[in-house]
């Protein structure tokens, strides 16, 4: 499975390289800016479609709170409560894939927000209960992403820092802390 993932990555990279080769100068510039993560590419005409898809994804993720809490106690426990754990996992993959895809499509790949924010919420709330974690993660993610975007504009006129240059400054220390804590 790992090798298949690597091969899909190589094929995708090849397609992107070909598209960049045949693209106009403006197209390549747009792609590079998108690749650095940028909220500036989202216009008001994109917002209704973006919000509709994100709202559906958030609603679907909120439906997963009870099954996720059951899974915290183990797959056998969740199955004894009547949950189909394989279906829950597949549903979770589809919902997170949808939310990640729509955000990446509009804003580019923004590193560390999705990786660090759930851990930040868990550390602040000191709970594993998804009834609290999911809403707080959604709000914390939006707040941290907007804070990082604000930091990007601090240099002043014409000096906008790419979003992916700021998010690792917050996300990487959190991930390192979580990894060190789990080892110790």
Indicate residue ranges for each PLM-predicted region.
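Alpha-helical transmembrane segments in inner-membrane proteins
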Residues: 1-184
């Amino acid at each position: 499975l790992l090798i298949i993932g690597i091969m899909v990555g190589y094929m995708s990279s090849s397609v992107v390289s070909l598209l960049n080769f045949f693209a106009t100068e403006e197209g390549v510039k747009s792609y590079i800016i998108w690749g650095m993560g940028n909220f500036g590419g989202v216009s008001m005409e994109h917002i209704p479609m973006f919000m509709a898809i994100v709202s559906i994804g958030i609603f679907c993720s909120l439906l997963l709170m009870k099954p996720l809490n059951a899974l915290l106690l183990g797959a056998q426990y969740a199955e004894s409560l009547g949950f189909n754990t394989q279906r829950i996992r597949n549903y979770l993959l589809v919902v997170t894939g949808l939310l990640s895809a729509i955000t990446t499509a509009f804003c580019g790949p923004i590193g560390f927000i999705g990786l660090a924010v759930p851990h930040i919420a868990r550390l602040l709330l000191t709970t594993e209960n998804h009834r609290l974690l999911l809403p707080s993660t959604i709000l914390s993610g939006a707040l941290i992403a907007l804070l990082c975007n604000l930091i990007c504009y601090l240099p002043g006129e014409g000096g906008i820092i790419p979003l992916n240059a700021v998010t690792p400054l917050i996300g990487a220390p959190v991930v390192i802390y979580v990894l060190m804590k789990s080892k110790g």
